[in-house]
Amino acid sequence: MSLSIVISQLFNGISLGSILLLIALGLAITFGQMNIINMAHGEFIMIGAYTTYLLQQLFIQYLPQAAFGYYFILAIPLAFIVAAFIGLLMEKSIVRFLYKRPLDSLLATWGVSLILQQAARTIFGAPNVAVVAPEWLNGGLMLLGVTFPYKRLFILALVLLSIFLLFVYLYKTPSGRRMKAVTLNREMASCLGVSTRKVDSRAFALGSGFAGIAGCSLTLIGSIGPTLGTAYIVDAFMIVILGGVGKLKGTIIAALMLGIVSTFVEMSTSATIAKLIVFAFIVIFLQWKPTGLVGTKVRALD
């Protein structure tokens, strides 16, 4: 195996891992803090993708062609806002009443998932639609005999920026520190005056917003449709569990591991077999370390 092939596969693995990470970040926030298995998380990816598509159509119809290159920059925060707003509505109207009822919340969010998919089919149609990338994202960077597409490099930069902003929010802002406190010990945070209800709403909106950004980035690598999110939601759950529920650092490590391992295994097998091998590895690993890569440390009384 030549060096260029190794570098190319490594880049593809990191690229895949970064996309999965962007999806799993939002899931880690909601699943880790609220213990809610949000089966509609994939549909927030779809919402972010269709928000990007709608903004593209508005630029094509109502703005001069010279402005088209800027639509994607505007689509990123817009996808976050739209997905976060819908997530906030979902939390306040449905999820809030299902805390500590895991089976009911699983069924309810699955129902919301089906409703959102059908709404997308009604509005946009069942066939997939394409989003045209701006001109400045076409082409690639040639280095060491390997072409690094600008689209993939942009997604990597977007993921790094998202991680940086998330950690700044969680560790440097009062709102983020309250969210961390609720994640670590909900009862103690409540006793100290933290409004866990407000924190839960904010966390669900934040997680949904990150899914929206993931949907926006996915428009750069393929067409989009009503079932876009279902192709990624299983991998996202595996990443969150492998990394350690509620552990963002573990989620980052697990996403990169899953992306790189899957890419190299696919070289000698198929995508389906590679996914089975990775899934078997995760099951075996969790038998050895049930808390994941970055588990919660606890003390026991003798």
Give names to the regions the model predicted:
Residues 2-11, 148, 169-174, 200-242, ...:
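Inter-helical junctions in multi-pass inner-membrane proteins, predominant
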Residues 65-112, 119, 253-258, 289-290:
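Alpha-helical transmembrane segments within multi-pass membrane transporters and channels
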Residues 43-50, 96-121, 229-241, 270-289:
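Pore- or pathway-lining transmembrane helices of multi-pass membrane proteins that form conduits
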Residues 97-98, 102-172, 199-202, 264, ...:
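Transmembrane helix-bundle core of multi-pass membrane transporters
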Residues 123, 135, 184-191, 195-198, ...:
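Cytosolic-side transmembrane-helix boundaries in multi-pass membrane proteins
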Residues 147-224, 248-253:
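Helix-loop-helix "hairpin" substructures at the membrane interface of multi-pass membrane proteins
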Residues 1-23, 51, 62-74, 101-106, ...:
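Membrane-interfacial amphipathic/re-entrant helices at transmembrane-helix boundaries
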Residues 6-55, 89, 93-104, 244-245:
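Single transmembrane alpha-helix segments in multi-pass membrane proteins
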